[in-house]
Amino acid sequence: MSDQLILKFPSHQAYKKEDFYVSPSNQEAYDFINSWPKWIKRTVNIFGPSGSGKSHLASILKSKTSCLQIETKKLSDEIFFKFKTKETLIIENLDKKVSEKLLFSLWNIALQDNKYLLITSKKPINSFKFKLRDLTSRVTSSLIIGINLPSDDLISAILAKNFSDKQITVEKKHIDYIVKRIDRSYEKISQFILTLDKYSLKKGSPFALKLIKEVLKMI
């Protein structure tokens, strides 16, 4: 068969509360999000590796409140008015390139107007070493929750959920095989799923063990 991609049904990424698999590695973050609006602190940072479920948790929060959700790279002065009309602001994938003055101003709005602020990032924001002292003070007074590396049960659930989202049927014994051999990294798990999906479509092959072994070697 040629290397041309064949027709596939559109995949659907489920970001509902009932689709989130809870394990000891993410229990604290999950419980905190679901405690809204009775948060012990109104500003929180949830951090963890790529694919750890931060965006899923953000979407769960978004379903509970009047919310503005935005990627860090899209932050601008225009967000001030928009935030004023919302109850909660979610800033995703915060990094050191963010404007410290802009972030500090948004933080102040959250505190002064009794709003909620959720920031997601790969690393805890108290490790960013901001130059603006007032911003550092805000960070220090906020709640910071980490999501740990996945357990075997969580890896299995992530694989099963993503295969289901993509309308793919994979035998449980093959999922067990993957769990025992894949790198214990959310990023690698995500990369494996995307690569397996891509190459099965290119080759027109079912999700046989042979293909799974090939993809595990590739990543």
Question: What are the residue ranges of the model-derived segments?
Answer:
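Walker A/P-loop nucleotide-binding motif
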Residues: 41-57
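The conserved phosphate-sensing helix
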Residues: 182-196
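Short regulatory helix/loop adjacent to the ATP-binding pocket of P-loop NTPases
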Residues: 125-140
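Conserved AAA+ ATPase "SRH/arginine-finger" region at the nucleotide-binding site
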Residues: 142-154
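Conserved P-loop NTPase "ATPase switch" module shared by AAA+ and STAND
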Residues: 82-106, 113-122
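Post-Walker A helix-loop "phosphate-sensing" segment adjacent to the P-loop in P-loop NTPases
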Residues: 62-73
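Short conserved motifs of the RecA-like P-loop NTPase core
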Residues: 169-182
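A short, basic N-terminal segment
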Residues: 1-35, 40, 201-219
